[in-house]
Amino acid sequence: MATRTNATVTHLSKHLELHQYHPDTIDSGEPRPTVVFLPWMNATQAHANHYRELYAVRGFNVLTVWGSLSYFLWPQWAMPLATELADYLEMQTRGPLVVHSMSVGAYLYAVTLTLIADNPDKYGSLGSRVKGHVYDSIVIGTLEEMARGVSIIVAPKSAMLQQAIRRSCLLYFAATKQHTVVPYNRFIDVVHNSPFKTPKLCFHSYNDVLCLPEAMERMIHHWKDEYDLDITSKMWQNSPHASHLRTDPQTYNRLLNDFLKKVGLDNISLQLSSKL
């Protein structure tokens, strides 16, 4: 079984980290698939390892993308990282790609999607190589709901501080509308109408205040109604934000297995990094 102890880890930059559990090619000589993993804002390496190893034991290598809350508060600051990520995927990877984004990590992916959608000639190969998306506890909703989400991320244990932060965020958004609200709306639209019309696996819960079930269901219905996409959705009644793997690992693993089979990436040869 592949674990973090036998991965070759390459820090490509401050924000990009490659865990190579297996050789670059599979037995057939084809390029090995890579998972692009965008974790939640306060995730640690230990947290990330739980998700990386989900894919390591299934034959994938994993590219982790580390973001910052500042990228959400001022979208223009996220553009260099989005460009770095898109350039790396286009120029430095050759095989199939699966994107697994969590919480605010999905926001950073939305910025990257917007860049890719605006530059189809530059990122042309990605359209055929991105095979599927896993959306886990993504922060989604209205501007009011996003402000509430920021307050919970910053002050998870103080309701009074959350209220102050939420109000400050709304004032901030009103004062910086052209630089924040307008880009947010574009990012949301691009996720709804992604250039990658792939199957999607969505994890969320009824009691998650950051990933509102009504907003998530609206997006899922849009994908199905407008694009006839294959969507698998699992909503728990009671499971903390970005903790569904811990809440119900059996169901999480089963649905992930089914999803990878659906996108044709379920029988990847395992050659652990000790053979590199």
PLM-predicted stretches and their roles:
Residues 97-103, 133, 202:
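Conserved alpha/beta-hydrolase fold motif
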Residues 2-71:
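Short, surface-exposed "cap/lid" segments of acyl-processing enzymes
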Residues 40-41, 139, 206-208:
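Residue-level signal for short, function-critical loop segments
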Residues 126-179:
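Hydrolase active-site cap/lid region
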Residues 68-93:
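Catalytic nucleophile-loop/oxyanion-hole region of alpha/beta-hydrolase
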